[in-house]
């Protein structure tokens, strides 16, 4: 389905029990909502008991690219615009990597719109100077070599070594999603990541139930970053997902879903 949000068509799915508590799934960069529908994925696990909304961030998946001038603030505007469009007053939000950055800024800006927070393979800190330089190098690489080469390099860094043997279909799916992403969107999103604000100072103000999950082998947003958020967010829960790196929801789906489902069940209706 498509919704017109901030003059951009945003692609989304809205499944499950329409009268149940809504859960919003926000994917990472540079993926799409399909990372949540991978075999026995989160959409399938939650749909029997929840209303599940998973969408493509602008410029990703089947959403419109627009002008390619992206910021995390704009991504938050789109999130709020989408839940307004869907008539959702308050939701549990689940964000992985970039999705986590969006969720953290959204709950900082609009805390009244969220009843729970799930942060996966993400962190509250803004990019360091070193990270910004790496983003700039990635933009140059996309412009020079195109999405296909970028995709090959990217998947090598986000999956645990054992995943390449255990779940080659997951690798293939993510690589194909990246390859189909417009260079303008890849570059615009890299700039958005590099310019995002640091939300660390707001973690102590988060008052909704919060679950944090991270792959034990995540080198991009490591377990130490998850532990720091866990210590800062009052009453938050932390689980380190074994046999997983930065794509913990796809690499160890059973473990990830177990913790997610149990957390959401505790919230009640």
What is the role of each PLM region?
Residues 8, 13, 34-94, 110, ...:
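Active-site loop/oxyanion-hole signature of alpha/beta-hydrolase fold enzymes
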Residues 28-32, 97:
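Active-site glycine-rich loops that stabilize anionic/oxyanionic intermediates
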Residues 101-152:
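Flexible "cap/lid" loop of the alpha/beta hydrolase fold
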Residues 127-133, 144-205:
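Conserved alpha/beta-hydrolase catalytic His-Asp/Glu region
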Residues 206, 212-214:
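Short beta-strand/loop motif that positions the catalytic acidic residue
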Residues 216-221:
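Acidic catalytic loop of the alpha/beta-hydrolase fold
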Residues 223, 227-246:
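Catalytic histidine neighborhood in serine/cysteine hydrolases
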Residues 244-257:
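Catalytic histidine-centered segment of alpha/beta-hydrolase-like enzymes
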